[in-house]
Amino acid sequence: HLTLPGYREMDKARDAARKRPIGTTGRGIGTTYSMKSERDGIRLADLDWDEKWNDLDDADKKFLEQFKDKLISMRVNIAAKMYEFRNDNILFEGAQGAMLDLDSGTYPYVSSGASCSAGAATGSGIGPKALDKIYGVFKAYETRVGNGPMPSEFNADTEGELCDYVRNTGNEFGVTTGRPRRCGYLDLVALRYACHVNSIDNLVLTHLDIYDDMNEIEACVAYDIDGKIVTDFPASIPDLNKAKPVLQKFDGWKADITKCTSYKKLPKAARNYVEFIEDFTGTKVGIVSVGADRNQTFVREKIWK
């Protein structure tokens, strides 16, 4: 499905009209999905379908006219192509986060599409049984863009300095909007939930080096909701809004791990932290990253057959 210029304005107007704005990026994605569900959208496959073309808004039609022939020449039958390469190694990379999935995320503060692992099948023309392994990529801390519950978010009044450090060191600013991302402690309750609903085989931990200068680090291991300790991720937005993080402390390592050449050479405190994540989520951390370069990524579990 194609996202057209007019969809952007519709996206912004719809969010502004909401009593509780979601905080959309205003790129027209939500409108594209809405048009798809209402069966009013236009697909790449429809560009030479005159009846569908004539349904377009004049401004969008004029814009699309510039690229129509080029786009038509680039079309392929994705389902057929996927079947052709069925015996090859193919990597599907999802966008956004598990908690923004339309069905299993923090609805209504979610994206309009399937950002869970199941979306790799529905969006690519293959069946779910064709997915051999599912990797879940996460940061060593929590981030969120836009509105919605985030129980482990740093408190602006008491943890503002920590928040600024994590945000600036991790370069946590929206790619589309440039606005600062909300940052917080790693939420292991949410991470475990994401592992369950996405059938994660292995986790991929990134930005571990963010903690290099800290004497101790903390992670959220439960929620305090009205005085009750909750260890399962709630489905209720009111519960999530009331949730206070129950934090567990870990020893820091006070060392520059970006220069480590293997996982085994990481400080023991760093390895202990990784292994706690594994125990808590019940999921192996198969890859650990301590920097942006390829040689700063340690593969602990074989990826391809």
Q: Model-flagged regions — what are they?
A:
Residues 1-305:
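Non-transmembrane, aqueous-exposed alpha-helical and coiled segments at domain scale
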